[in-house]
């Protein structure tokens, strides 16, 4: 535990305990907290010890409390991909500084910070200062929430849930998604993301949170995924169409139909876009998604040995 006159910072490696202690805080702005809420809920559902240490070298959650003991901010580090970034939601500046200093003090190298501004930037810049490194923005993100849905015209074919027979294709397209998104945004290197394994893909298919669009010939031409709802919010993504099938309306219609299904059951829908990708921003705004907040992915580079 780290404390100051105004803030107490507590770490835990127990996702169930974290959710129990922060449930009210996360529910205040459930769209903003979608990543931490959904990822942590998924880990609670998983069997104890699921995943290997190599897949997840860091696994913690942090709770910042004010002087009255009320939760004032949260963060986590559970990413199974290099540079294993922390994810930070809004918190007081002294809490963000305390988080960076606590990690540095225990010798935990931090290669990236994702999440809400300005807190994520404060953590990244303080980490860089302490380590003699440099914090830089890799990706500017925008979080959108569905307002009034505008259902676009349907291209030929139909949307259907993926089945286990589709698992190999779904896995390949999940893995291709980051590279395709980076290309559309004009970047040469994608931001690191989870390297999905087959068991994770099968679990998503069994949970019916992966959909495919089949064209009129029965060929699969598009994939859209989502998260299981957490605090009444689902996050749509990834949204992937192979290069030779783009521009035909598959993504717009698939996301709209999936959003319509969730909204009919009272679930709020949100998604992230890369601000540098004009294609995706236009597509989602056209079907009724509206900006909520800008977020950021930062990397921290430190000098190597002389």
Question: For each predicted feature, which ranges?
Answer:
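Conserved active-site alpha-helix within GNAT-family acetyltransferase domains
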Residues: 118-136, 252, 276-293
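A conserved beta-turn-beta hairpin within the catalytic core of GNAT-like acetyltransferases
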Residues: 81-86, 228-236
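Conserved beta-strand-loop-alpha-helix junction that forms the acyl-donor binding cleft
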Residues: 114-120, 243, 271-285, 298-304
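Acyl-donor-binding surface of acyltransferase catalytic domains
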Residues: 67-71, 77-156, 298
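Short amphipathic alpha-helix that is part of the acyltransferase structural core
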Residues: 1-36, 149-190
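Recognition helices and adjacent regulatory flanks at domain boundaries
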Residues: 213-215, 226-227, 248-261, 272-274, ...
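Conserved beta-hairpin
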Residues: 41-79, 202, 206-224
């Amino acid at each position: 535990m780290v404390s100051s006159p105004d803030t107490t910072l507590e770490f835990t490696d127990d996702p169930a305990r974290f959710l129990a202690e922060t449930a009210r805080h996360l529910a205040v702005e459930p769209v903003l907290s979608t990543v931490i809420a959904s990822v942590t809920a998924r880990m609670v559902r998983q069997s104890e010890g699921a995943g290997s240490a190599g897949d997840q070298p860091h696994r913690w959650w942090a709770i910042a409390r004010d002087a009255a003991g009320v939760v004032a901010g949260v963060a986590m580090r559970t990413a199974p991909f290099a540079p294993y970034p922390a994810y930070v939601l809004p918190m007081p500046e002294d809490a963000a500084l305390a988080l960076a200093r606590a990690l540095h003090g225990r010798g935990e190298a931090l290669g990236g910070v994702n999440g809400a501004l300005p807190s994520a930037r404060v953590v990244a810049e303080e980490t860089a200062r302490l380590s003699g490194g440099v914090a830089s923005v890799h990706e500017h993100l925008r979080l959108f929430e569905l307002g009034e849905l505008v259902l676009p015209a349907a291209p030929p074919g139909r949307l259907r849930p993926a089945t286990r027979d589709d698992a190999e294709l779904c896995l390949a397209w999940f893995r291709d998604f980051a590279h395709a998104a980076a290309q559309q945004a004009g970047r040469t290197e994608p931001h690191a993301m989870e390297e999905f394994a087959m068991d994770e893909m099968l679990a998503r298919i069994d949970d019916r949170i992966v959909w495919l669009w089949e064209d009129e010939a029965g060929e699969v031409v598009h994939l859209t995924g989502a998260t299981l709802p957490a605090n009444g919010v689902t996050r749509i993504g990834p949204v992937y169409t192979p290069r030779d099938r783009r521009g035909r309306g598959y993504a717009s219609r698939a996301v709209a139909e999936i959003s319509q299904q969730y909204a009919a059951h009272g679930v709020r829908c949100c998604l992230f876009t890369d601000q540098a990708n004009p294609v995706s921003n236009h597509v989602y705004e056209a079907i009724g998604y509206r900006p909520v907040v800008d977020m950021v992915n930062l990397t921290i580079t430190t000098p190597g040995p002389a």
